[in-house]
Amino acid sequence: MCEKTTNVPDLFGKMVFGEQQMQQRLPAAAYQKWQQCLAQGTPLDRTTAGEIANAMKDWAIEKGATHYTHWFQPMTGVTAEKHDSFITRDGKDGVVMELSAKELSKGEADASSFPSGGLRATFEARGYTAWDPTSYAFVKDETLYIPTIFCSYSGQTLDKKTPLLRSMRVLDRECIRILRLFGNTEAQHVTPQVGPEQEYFLIDEKVYRQREDLKLCGRTLFGARPSKGQELDDHYYGAIKPRVAAFMRELDQELWKLGVLAKTEHNEVAPAQHEIAPIYSDANSACDKNQLTMELLKKVAARHGLVCLLHEKPFAGVNGSGKHDNWSLATDTGENLLKPGSTPSQNAQFLLFLAAFIKGVDEYQEMLRCCVSYPGNDHRLGGNEAPPAIISIFLGDELTAILDAIIQGTEYVDITKKKLTIGVDTLPEIPQDTTDRNRTSPLAFTGNKFEFRMLGSSQSIASPNVVLNTIMAEELRQFADILEKADDFQSALQKLLHDTFTAHQRIIFNGNGYDDAWVQEAKRRGLANLRDTVDCMPAYIDKKNVDLFTKHAILTETEMRARYEIHLENYCKVSAIEASTLLDMVQRHILPAASAYADRLTQTAFHKENSVPALSARMEKTLAQRVTDLGEKLFDTCEALHAALSDAPAADGGIDAARYYRCEIVTRTQKAGELIGRLESLVDAKAWPYPTYADILFSV
């Protein structure tokens, strides 16, 4: 629970076995070997691993832990864990508390019980977890959590962390090659830095428990638009309600204890919608901590009689929830490689990294779109509340003008009338507020980072960052190959920047992404417009993308195909669950309520006409007819939906099954939801069986 007085520096990282704890508790030699392991990627010997395991166990027991778990991130998108106690026989009918080097380093899990895309059959159940020493262990709920990767018996990747770690390693290598070309010999490592802004909804637990769709699907499948939504713009940055503020205070403290750099909280645009944003950390740590954040959002909410909804579109008619992935590159000497430089060399270096990013996004736009595609996000992307489904980059007017000057071979003149020659002069300072105004862009440069805005609120940030890291590494590799062979570095650099910006300027768009004209303009430019998950998934097995990930040993072709199959199967299963839930709600509650209300209206009309012949019953008859007509349309739609479900192919039927579900199941589920919303607006509130949007959104 929330501590009344908080000394944040003392509280922060209290439940984390971090570097400070290691330095205090490990023998000096073991501590040095651990640091060497992190710096060079060398494996730990069994003796050192045993010393770390023993120190970790002793510390965890002091924090109240009795169990440990290998904490991993399978392809479900959420974390998984199996708890084992520290106890072992002491040989005298008692027990002692132990954690061996083997128990720290390696665990076993039933790989066939997690999504594997055919990599693991039920009779090939064995899978392994392996300790990730780059991510700190922590204690939560009297259990020591050890971050791990997850793979099959034969070594095939079954999780989201392993590709992320590999992509970071490849990106590090290629960034260093570029830095050496610019004379930087001090930096030894470059790490992608990530800060995910997490959006969510908070509603009262009582109304949540009255909606089967929220409980089973995480979102409402129907609802009439409330009289007041977000039209007045009064919720965004508005005063935080006391109950929500109490929740946020406790959430902060729980996150701080676990080393999560929770920094900013505020109300979002939609009623009951909020956001929490952390300080940046390396991509691997940021991914782990975002998973912890999502878990604690739900747990802390429950302690306050609230429910946290992480679905991308829990309510129709108001904004859904996303997760902005702020991505940058930092050296171990503290330099941000995406920050415009203050010297001629840094100026050219920044433009080269910018060119690599632009080229990568243009060449692999389908893969970027694919990595944020799943059923929940299909309801959000492309609406006038979230980035469009078309990938583009927003740079702002000043930076775009600099690129135009490079493309046209002219001198750039800044607002002070100073001319700019690339590699000779410094870039003018680009005020952040001039590059952070376009909220309709899926990828925006915001002064010293790129903000990838297409992520859904419930998804792991691992896959999007794997794609960003890998495409950046590939383009930097190509650039380094060219520049390392150049006789005249400056001339080669000038030509490379000119050619790259010229070839890939089509991906830059500073306009309104919500405008219908952009769809036509994007088509003219040859940009991909992949509208939903089913359209996106073939990108996973496109030869260009398979070659990219196999070339850098991020994923094998088999692992890419497995992910393709997993996502398609998930699409079918989610669609079936939502359709079945809606059918149950309609048949058992909504149609009976509508029928009973129509009957009541007709009885009232009958009594009025028979008791006082001059008394009009037009209102009752009209309402009864409208309710009956809508009820029959809903009944027919649900009958067709039920038949479509009965005829549906198996969920693991690949792209053909997914197309069937999109055409026959999803469209009918949506149509039924619209009809229910119209019925809800007609039926007596006392007779309607479920809380309305107004009841839910304004319940806190």
What are these language model-derived features?
Residues 1, 5-20, 169, 173, ...:
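Flexible inter-domain linker/hinge segments
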Residues 65, 69-73, 289-303, 329, ...:
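Hydrophobic/aromatic-rich, well-ordered segments within soluble, folded domains that form packed cores
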Residues 124-310, 319-322, 329-565:
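Glycine-rich, acidic/polar active-site loops that bind/position phosphate-bearing ligands
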